[in-house]
């Protein structure tokens, strides 16, 4: 937990401070701080589910489940804070886009937190450590690493108003999709040759599908970052258009 606290402190340095800030500016700064805290919690949750999978650490997996309640509480607080800003300040232009973007980012992060909790529950209910051959052939650890790297990079894009980095997410998610597609074949082959380890196969493929959904949420977040900075709505646009 100390590591997460230190990381949060480092990220708070990216949030601008000014002696001439208006009340709305102060509220937006606080809102960005809260969403950053939630972001780092979700990243930590995914790291822990990876570790609990590798080490078959049920206690760590239970810690992930317990922490999800804190993420849910923070999501509700951010929602309320956004509603208060709408009601009290009637923001316009870039301020309005910032609040709208954070509101949607908040939802995507909360869902990613739910996914981490769901993955942790597979480790909790599994009867045996996961077969290393299955872990290797499905590339689930590589998928974990890429998903977490994408989640960390969309945070950097948010903190630095970096639309180029945000746009790179659309291309990088292809690796996550590719692993997901290949894993279906790998798991089917594994179950056929290891009929006594069907549970392993079903749990691993379920984890991979959940990680693929985190990648989708990261793409949604990248769209909101671009909307916030450039006032461009990318929803329903083709991948080629999003990358332009």
Predicted features along the sequence, with ranges:
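Cytosolic, long alpha-helical scaffolding segments
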Residues: 2-244
